[in-house]
Regions:
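Active-site and adjacent substrate-binding regions of carbohydrate-active enzymes
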Residues: 1-520, 528-553, 561-565
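Flexible, gly/pro- and Lys/Arg-enriched active-site loops
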Residues: 524
Length: 565
């Protein structure tokens, strides 16, 4: 059976966009309390404009107890006071637009905070009450209901169920949470849940946001029977991952997005490796785009990377939607560190502390990966600090850690704090311009980060910041990145090469030795210094055809020794 190709989606700005992910708590602190905020972000918008990105995606900025970095939302229509006010958010959206930057915000629909009025009302109401119908409350198993209702496990470790206490002080029902106990899952079979989130979408679209990033987009729908995973037959629908009911939800959301004069964008966080299954979310009446997590997790190996790129382009092709590319985000090990290890892949199950890392090698590979990613067709998502080549901070003191993943694993998993350390902007010592002098950032910055600051890198043409600015600028200015057809060029073992139309050739060397480059081309940009005839180890280059040579003048590399071109 062959997958059916969907009609092509209209090509809006998101098809080729470079989107910069802002984790506001760690971006810039305007008031000196140690927490990044909207004042800091507004002051640093010129950095994003200079970088050349098309949009910024802001992770949750809503009212929240911050049990999971803001992904436990208490009020979807207000800004957390730690970040600022709703009025400031509206100013930010307008100021970004004036700089030709679109704003994408995060919506967290699978769950909300235990502090949300809905859940407070549910806890105050008795079992079987309408207030509890918006969640998954169930009696426990066992003689006294002392066992969880089923065998589901939290994504962060431990059971996916927490028991409540009734008004009389006795143990009560259990509620479902696929993440932390502070994040009860909503029941998307309840019409009030659907109506509420459709209203939330309109609330933010009305305020000028250009798009919505949908958190955990493939987890919302649950089998009403909540069966034990151990009883689900092989090949049967999963009780809470990638269920058929999801598509009706996103069709309704797409109708809302399409109702605005300049259609707004829906981008899904969807952890599905099957390209055909992923493509179903990208049909013309559902989501516009989805994150490419297979690419993020792929090791630094030419063959594996090519397989991942082919599968990703196939998924987009099936849905006639843009591919998307991401190397890092606020949940995963930073690229420089991951690429400096023996195992360069990423898997949540394999996250551990104390893995030997060669940061110099990781930096070379990360620079090459930046050019690879920015040359691919589709949209690119760039996590804050990647443009500075920041490594993972692996030596945070135990008392400084905040991530529930770390605590729920009893310290075995280092958690995600290491990729969330506040950005360095200027100066020679912490807080490195993150906040006013004397600011104590909410996570401590390494004392040796002075070379990573924006200030230091702006003065260094060999810095990661210069590389990103030049590459993003070329991507914006060259038509090949918008319209150039993608096709592989066979270039030998450990090398990937592809063309975008006839005007651009990208070559990536995954090996530890120099490799020859094709004749008749001029270097546009290289991740490492290039002599013109060869590409350095663990490096990438963008080439364009050279003008015709005059009589007796060679065109680039004329050597045929070991040259696959």
């Amino acid at each position: 059976m062959h997958a059916t190709r969907s009609p092509r989606q209209p090509r809006g700005w998101w098809w080729h966009a470079v989107v910069y992910q802002v984790y506001p708590r760690s971006f810039a602190d305007g008031d000196g309390d140690g927490t990044g905020d909207l004042a800091g972000l507004r002051a640093r918008l010129p950095h994003l404009a200079a970088l050349g990105v098309d949009a910024l995606w802001i992770t949750p900025w809503y009212r929240s107890p911050m049990a999971d970095g803001g992904y436990d939302v208490a009020d979807y229509r207000d800004i957390d006071p730690a970040f600022g006010t709703l009025a400031e958010a509206e100013l930010l959206i307008a100021e970004a637009r004036a700089l030709d930057l679109a704003v994408v915000v995060d919506i967290v629909p699978n769950h909300l905070s235990v502090r949300h009025p809905w859940f407070r009302a549910a806890l105050a109401a008795p079992a079987g009450s309408p207030e509890r119908d918006r969640f998954h409350f169930r009696p426990g198993r066992g003689e006294s209901g002392e066992l969880p209702p089923n065998d589901w496990r939290s994504e962060f470790g431990g059971p996916a169920w927490t028991r409540t206490t009734d008004a009389d002080g006795k143990p009560g029902e259990w509620y479902l949470h696929l993440f932390t106990p502070d994040q009860p899952d909503l029941d998307w079979n309840h019409p009030a849940v659907r109506a509420e989130f459709e209203s939330v979408l309109r609330f933010w679209f009305d305020r000028g946001v250009a798009g919505i990033r949908v958190d955990s987009a493939n987890l919302l729908a649950k089998d009403p029977a909540l069966p034990d995973l151990a009883t689900v037959a092989s090949g049967a629908p999963h009780p809470y991952v990638d269920r058929e009911e999801l598509h009706d939800i996103y069709r309704a959301w797409r109708r809302i997005a399409a109702s605005y004069p300049d259609e707004r964008v829906l981008i899904g966080e969807i952890w599905i490796r099957d390209a055909a299954r992923l493509a179903r979310y990208l049909r013309p009446d559902e989501l516009h785009a989805a994150f490419n997590f297979a690419f993020l997790g792929s090791p630094w190996e030419a063959a594996r990377m090519r397989e991942t790129i082919d599968a990703s382009l196939a998924a987009g092709g099936l849905a006639a939607a843009p591919a998307s590319w991401v190397l890092c985000n606020h949940d995963v090990t930073r690229t420089v560190t991951r690429y400096g290890r023996a195992d360069t892949s990423f898997d949540f199950a394999a996250v551990a502390a104390g893995i030997p890392t060669d940061l110099a090698l990781g930096t070379r590979r990360a620079r090459a990966a930046a050019l690879l990613t920015l040359a691919l067709p589709g949209s690119v998502y760039l996590y804050q600090g990647e443009e500075l080549g920041l490594p993972e901070v692996e030596d945070l003191p135990p008392q400084a850690r905040r991530d529930p993943v770390h605590f729920r694993s009893h310290g075995e998993n280092p958690g995600r704090d290491g990729c969330r350390v506040p950005l360095p902007w200027s100066g020679q010592a912490p807080p490195f311009g993150f906040g006013p002098p004397g600011t104590l950032p909410w996570l401590p910055q390494p004392g040796n980060w002075a070379p990573y600051t924006v200030e230091a890198q702006e003065a260094d043409p060999a810095s990661p910041l210069w590389l990103y600015r030049r590459a993003v600028g070329l991507r914006r200015s060259l038509a090949a990145f918008r319209d150039g057809a993608f096709r592989w060029v066979e270039a030998g073992e450990d090398v990937l090469a592809f063309r975008r139309g006839d005007a651009l050739l990208c070559v990536v060397n995954f090996s530890g030795r120099p490799v020859p480059l094709p004749a008749g081309h001029t270097v546009l940009i290289s991740s490492e210094p290039s002599g013109g005839d060869t590409l350095a180890a663990h490096a990438a280059v963008w080439l364009t055809p050279s003008p015709p040579a005059g009589p007796g003048r060679p065109r680039g590399n004329t050597s045929t020794d070991g040259n696959p071109w």
